[in-house]
Amino acid sequence: MRVRYKPWAEDYLKDHPELVDMDGQHAGEMTEWFDKTQPIHIEIGSGMGQFITTLAAQNPHINYISMEREKSIVYKVLDKVKEMGLTNLKIICNDAIELNEYFKNGEVSRIYLNFSDPWPKNRHAKRRLTYHTFLALYQQILNDEGDLHFKTDNRGLFAYSLESMSQFGMYFTKINLNLHQEDDGSNILTEYEKKFSDKGSRIYRMEAKFHSQK
């Protein structure tokens, strides 16, 4: 997705340090950042925030972190958080490779990866969010019962991710090869998901854990 640069976005985000971490000021203090101590769920690559703000509104007993590196998108998440009055959702404007700088070992209960960039060229495989380098970070910050939820419309990325997770030592608790055909009504659509499902694109989904967590 091509993002149009918003020169004012950075200053806007910096005006709300209580909601947005721009430079690691809350690194290692994620639990303390919230008003209440509750389980923490993360969405990496939140886009415009429809998915995670909906989750936060539906589940006030869970604390949510939206992690998105594009400042020119993050402001839309911030707008939603303010408009909805969400006190259980914070935003990190940074790259996922910095996860272990922000979260303590075992601090996170769930990670969501929704419609991540597939990076289709083999030479870019290391950038995929299901590459083993990222899986190692997820394993580090997830607690013993923690899991990973993954959705994509890209069949190649889904197949790659299944293989990558299996090789890393993960097991799958749920796999959907056509989510919207099998959906029980609990699925929350992202902006991207709605756009492509309306065109008839198949959506793939999985839930996974690390074997060491059994």
Swiss-Prot record:
Which named protein is this?
A: tRNA (guanine-N(7)-)-methyltransferase
GO MF: tRNA (guanine(46)-N7)-methyltransferase activity
Cross-referenced InterPro entries: SAM-dependent_MTases_sf, tRNA_(Gua-N-7)_MeTrfase_Trmb, tRNA_methyltr_TrmB_bact
Residues annotated as transmembrane? none
Q: Does the keyword S-adenosyl-L-methionine apply?
A: yes
Which SUPFAM superfamilies does the entry mention? Answer: S-adenosyl-L-methionine-dependent methyltransferases (SSF53335)
Residues annotated to bind S-adenosyl-L-methionine: 43, 68, 95, 117
Keyword vocabulary terms for this entry: Methyltransferase, S-adenosyl-L-methionine, Transferase, tRNA processing
Q: What is its EC number?
A: 2.1.1.33
- The active site is formed by 117
Binding positions (substrate): 121, 153, 190-193
Free-text function comment from the UniProt entry: Catalyzes the formation of N(7)-methylguanine at position 46 (m7G46) in tRNA.
Enumerate the catalysed reactions. Answer: guanosine(46) in tRNA + S-adenosyl-L-methionine = N(7)-methylguanosine(46) in tRNA + S-adenosyl-L-homocysteine
The protein's annotated pathway: tRNA modification; N(7)-methylguanine-tRNA biosynthesis
Family under the similarity heading: Belongs to the class I-like SAM-binding methyltransferase superfamily. TrmB family.
Which superkingdom does the taxonomy of this entry point to? Bacteria
Pfam families, alphabetized: Methyltransf_4 (PF02390)
Naming one, the record's GO cellular component terms include:
tRNA methyltransferase complex
